[in-house]
């Protein structure tokens, strides 16, 4: 498919007083990153008017959806996502059944996730939670994964702040926020704690438009001189407020990624089951501390925390996302087929390319007669699955799987003209998808990559391979994926 028109991308996310606004916030952050190149449309059941008004500038259009069961919604996908080139799903109701219905209707879709609970059928999975590995998911073998804080879903003011981040503690002001809803009113519980209040000079408290305890919170804040309340702030206003506070108490949700982009000492309190993994990861990595640690953190631990935050939150996640979407739509032009006799010469040229030989285990040049014999043998071998990938009618890569004893050894080569464009994962994904569809049996797929071949390692690691040290080849890694249809 060649895109002569601007691709249309639908974002499917909801928000309300019960589930909060995190799904809409992070989906809108992603949409704002790519909307200069794509027509972004939000399909939502959210009915909070000022929330929709605040994000309306991001989307070309907002589609208001009725309340119905999600299975019924999925069966109407062709009406909801009319002429969609891509759908981004962000929410727990968009489970395996919902996704399978989209597959039936031949939609292409990504998932934004944070709990890796149900099976996924998405082309790409984005999870900025940290500590999650591709093989922790039950997904299609060709699914690509973009995981960890390097892929934080942040709005532009927070990305800009990360490039000028705070690197030392200069006050005892505390930023407090538990998301857009805070249904259990954790905000007020924290502020009422004498043990917490005694450690900070000021509290700057932000609540969202879905927060229903505003009057109760205001009555308490009015009784204290050092508690200041804010509601429904813009992202620019939140950044400004965060810059005034060297400490934060918040939930392990989108807000903590935003605060860590500004930089500061974070104390986390879990308010939802899906936050358990994030809180373990962030405290385990020293990025944040538990709320019970308030008053017990040494200065050196705070310094190390700020340093680690600066490593993960570099303000460049928007660049990474734009690259992912460019590669995805570029890759949709790829066509894969079995190798034919006419591919003999191009495969010979690829095999003798200088860069290819340097990363091969046999680095000697290959003669044409030797190559010809090998090529025809592989084409005629029933255990060899030899594919050519084309783009716009031109061969750009070969992917080959050699099956033996329940194992398929994978190898691939790419034409010089497409190297260094980040297409390695797309090529592998295309090849794996074709192979498992052709083979149709349980199989272990294995690839070997030299320690020095960083681009190829990066390509494998965006798929559900397990990485181990190779015992077959020196100075190499072994990548293993088990497929069970």
Residue ranges and their predicted role:
Residues 333-346, 351, 390-485:
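Acyl-donor (CoA/ACP) binding surface of acyl/acetyltransferases
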Residues 121-185, 215:
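A nucleotide-sugar donor-handling region in carbohydrate enzymes
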Residues 243-254, 267:
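Acidic donor-binding loop of glycosyltransferase active sites
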Residues 11-21, 26-33, 45-58, 62-140:
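Active-site and donor-binding regions of nucleotide-sugar-utilizing enzymes
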Residues 375-388, 397:
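A short helix-loop-beta-strand connector motif used in the catalytic cores of GNAT acetyltransferases and
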Residues 300, 314-333:
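C-terminal alpha-helical cap of glycosyltransferases
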Residues 256-301:
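Catalytic binding pocket for nucleotide-activated donors in carbohydrate/polymer assembly enzymes
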Residues 168-244:
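Donor-nucleotide binding loops and adjacent catalytic segments primarily
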């Amino acid at each position: 498919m060649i895109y002569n028109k601007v691709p249309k991308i639908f974002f499917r996310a909801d928000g309300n007083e019960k589930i909060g606004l995190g799904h809409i916030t992070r989906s809108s952050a992603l949409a704002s990153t790519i909307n200069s190149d794509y027509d972004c449309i939000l399909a939502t059941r959210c009915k909070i008017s000022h929330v929709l008004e605040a994000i309306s500038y991001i989307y070309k259009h907002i589609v208001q959806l009725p309340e119905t069961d999600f299975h019924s919604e999925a069966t109407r996908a062709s009406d909801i996502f009319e002429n969609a080139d891509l759908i981004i799903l962000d929410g727990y109701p968009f489970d395996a059944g919902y996704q399978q219905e989209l597959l039936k209707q031949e939609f292409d879709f990504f998932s934004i996730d944070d709990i890796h609970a149900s099976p996924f059928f998405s082309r790409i999975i984005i999870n900025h939670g940290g500590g999650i590995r591709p093989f922790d998911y039950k997904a299609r073998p060709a699914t690509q994964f973009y995981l960890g804080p390097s892929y934080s879903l942040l709005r532009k003011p927070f990305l800009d702040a990360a490039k000028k981040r705070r690197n030392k503690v200069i006050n005892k002001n505390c930023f407090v926020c538990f998301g857009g809803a805070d249904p259990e009113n954790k905000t007020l519980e924290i502020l009422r704690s004498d043990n917490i209040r005694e450690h900070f000079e000021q509290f700057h408290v932000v609540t969202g438009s879905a927060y229903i305890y505003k009057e109760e919170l205001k009555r308490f804040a009015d009784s204290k001189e050092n508690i200041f309340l804010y509601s429904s702030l813009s992202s620019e206003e939140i950044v400004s407020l965060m810059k005034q506070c060297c400490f934060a108490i918040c939930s392990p949700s989108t807000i903590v990624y935003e605060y860590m982009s500004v930089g500061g000492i974070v104390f986390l309190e879990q308010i939802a089951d899906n936050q358990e993994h994030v809180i373990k990861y962030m405290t385990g990595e020293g990025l944040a501390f538990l709320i019970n640690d308030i008053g017990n953190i040494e200065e050196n631990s705070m310094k190390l925390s700020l340093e680690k935050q600066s490593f993960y939150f570099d303000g460049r996640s928007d660049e990474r996302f734009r690259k992912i979407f460019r590669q995805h739509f570029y890759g949709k032009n790829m066509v894969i087929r079995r190798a034919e006799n006419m591919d003999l010469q191009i495969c010979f040229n690829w095999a003798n390319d200088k860069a290819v030989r340097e990363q091969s285990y046999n680095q000697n040049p290959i003669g044409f007669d030797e190559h010809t014999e090998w090529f025809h043998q592989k084409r005629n071998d029933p255990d060899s699955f030899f594919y050519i990938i084309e783009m716009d009618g031109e061969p750009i890569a070969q992917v080959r799987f050699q099956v033996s004893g329940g194992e398929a050894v994978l190898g691939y080569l790419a034409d010089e003209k497409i190297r260094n464009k980040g297409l390695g994962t797309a090529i592998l994904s295309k090849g794996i998808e074709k192979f498992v569809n052709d083979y149709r049996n349980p199989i272990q797929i294995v690839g070997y990559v030299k320690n020095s071949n960083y681009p190829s390692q990066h390509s494998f690691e965006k798929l559900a391979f397990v990485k181990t040290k190779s015992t077959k080849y020196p100075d190499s890694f072994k990548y293993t994926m088990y497929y069970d249809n």
